[in-house]
Amino acid sequence: MKSRGLVRFFFSILAVGALITSIVGFALKWGEYRGLFLTFEAGQIFSVLFWFIGVGMIFSVISQMGFFVFLTVHRFALEILRSSSLWNLLQLFFILFVAFDLMYVRFLFFGESGESLAGYAWLPVFLLIFGVITAYIKQKQSSKKTFVSSLFLMVVITALEWFPALRVNDEDWLYLMLFPLMACNAFQLLMLPKFAAK
């Protein structure tokens, strides 16, 4: 990729992170921010918006670092194992392991008496479904060989990037961080070839 394309790619991901974080941020706290829009308190609206944009850009940078790690690990794994089928099996194992951990470990650490394990299942299931859809689109875009690796990025790498919010376990922060990370990772996965071709 040429330097101009790399810069455009970087700033495009920043924009995706800022946009999604702003939308999710206002949606999560709409009860609080609704009054600002009804009375059109522009100063406070823009103050909150700039904060969301800044946070979203941080999330997008985390996503880009995760994507770089993914590309590096993928390349090294193929060179060391010398078998794409073995690497795919390992990736599938990690995908299932992480998806289970997102449910079970969170339940162990944060579950309260009376809560069921099922209450912690929907976020990893949602992440898996989104990952499968994104990986399917990537497969259609390139080849069948990319499906498992794409799913690995969307589940395992996203979960690693999401760890700060998982550790805090604040519901608003869980959503505020997850959706931008998913969007940025999907954008990088699907749009990198188009930027590289320019």
UniProtKB/Swiss-Prot annotation:
Keyword field contains Glycosyltransferase: no
Alphabetically ordered keywords of this record: Cell membrane, Membrane, Sporulation, Transmembrane, Transmembrane helix
Subcellular location: Cell membrane
UniProt membrane topology term: Multi-pass membrane protein
Annotated knockout phenotype: No effect on sporulation as single mutant, but when associated with deletion of kinA, sporulation efficiency is significantly decreased.
Major site of localization recorded for this protein: membrane
Transmembrane segments: 9-29, 42-62, 90-110, 117-137, 146-166, 173-193
Keyword Magnesium set for record: no
Functional summary from the UniProt entry: Involved in the activation of the KinB signaling pathway of sporulation.
Descriptive protein name: KinB-signaling pathway activation protein
Native organism: Bacillus subtilis (strain 168)
